């Protein structure tokens, strides 16, 4: 789990006079949220906010879904007005990674604005994945993941805009690049601010354990003369390492000695990795590039024409920067999911393009980084983690109709924009969003229920994942509900039918599940690439004419596996998750959410 608590304390009398780091962090975060709340639905003045907010999409279906949701948000005045909001879609064909998406976005900006964008502050949010590790975000996008916060509720987009609210005021024209599924919180001095005003690239850096460093980018900073660490430091960077081994961190002098670090300054996934005298490194999150650097990358992209390999905005752009950068990394493909023949050559071209460009680092010594991109992280942060709950003011019941929630062993359930009967039970550790649950529904612990409608008697086993989608098939409205275990690995794939026994559904051998459902093992059982067979491409989810029938039918197949009792799927039209996303009816899903919103609003006004 990528949960990182980063904190350095100043020594001496200064530390004694200040609030504890966790208090400063909470107050700074709440101030940003209040400021953003004031701007929602208001016309912002030039320079007060971003000139452009751009979101990347993987394909045209995702582009349409994002544009529909942005349109609804603007209509409901949930976002600042007077800002240009865009969705930029990757070109059809080979996957190009977030680096390729960045290049594509630059080209889109040039086409839309010509030379005008050289005076704009631009936020670019990468949200072009299919969220296979958190599938309730697959249909409508990671950047539109609902949070238990705000009225109307915040989604990740609003939270990003809130946390970065101070940036545009202190930024030269250029582009801030970030991802859709992480949260950066930080606290700095009352009269300090983060400046993005240097030429080249500027990145935020956070102190982290060496273990966390192996899954992030790590900065090799130039020596620092000041004996006291401050909340905000501007540092120069010698070179950038992408997901290095601990051995490499030491080899390239990326490791800092403990000094003023305290063990309580780390939390979440770092606790087990740290000792009181732990060494640490500075890891990455978001980065900024000035307009000159952006234009240089754009000229490069227009020269090469079409990309045929995945480029990483962090691994391939940042590793080329700083005086200590060397070309060796271009041949290291150990962190690459799919190795294309052109990848090494493309990396080398990018290296020679960017070599000599400066990499400036803004060190935030009292900061936190949260990644919410998996079912495990999602459940933990929304139901169990008191730190994030305190910092953001997360609630157990957010804009919902539901009785009080009991707490058990520090865990609560989390209900987001849903209507639940008072006799319905939801066990601690579970999240319910955009759903209606009747009086005879019981939800076990550690479940995720999304977009569902259950009025009949139903028991959802612990650790269930249930997410319903509206579909448009042959111009008819249909529904399908994906159901499996929250710990199932949807990305794990095998190459042949004989190996599908290696896949697991709800912790049970997938081959055994097919027997329970009376389904035969044939190539037709899977959609898409027939040499990449996975739960993601398995045609096992029934298509139904109503939302409630869809949920109940999928729950029957889930319970059949749990209880080892037969439930034949032979009579149903079956889809894979991959196909459900192709047929998804975004408009109907938004309408369903809007109906819940209006009903809650009406009942709240009568109370």
Swiss-Prot record:
It catalyses: beta-L-fucose 1-phosphate + GTP + H(+) = GDP-beta-L-fucose + diphosphate. It is found in: Cytoplasm. Expressed in many tissues. GO terms for molecular function: fucose-1-phosphate guanylyltransferase activity; GTP binding. Residues 1-21 are annotated as: Disordered. GO terms for cellular component: cytoplasm; cytosol. It comes from the Eukaryota. Optimum pH is 6.8 to 7.8. It is an enzyme of class 2 (transferase). SUPFAM superfamilies: Trimeric LpxA-like enzymes. Its EC number is 2.7.7.30. Keywords: Cytoplasm, GTP-binding, Nucleotide-binding, Nucleotidyltransferase, Transferase. One of its GO terms (biological process) is GDP-L-fucose biosynthetic process. PANTHER family: FUCOSE-1-PHOSPHATE GUANYLYLTRANSFERASE (PTHR15045:SF1). Catalyzes the formation of GDP-L-fucose from GTP and L-fucose-1-phosphate. Functions as a salvage pathway to reutilize L-fucose arising from the turnover of glycoproteins and glycolipids. This is Fucose-1-phosphate guanylyltransferase. It comes from Homo sapiens (Human).
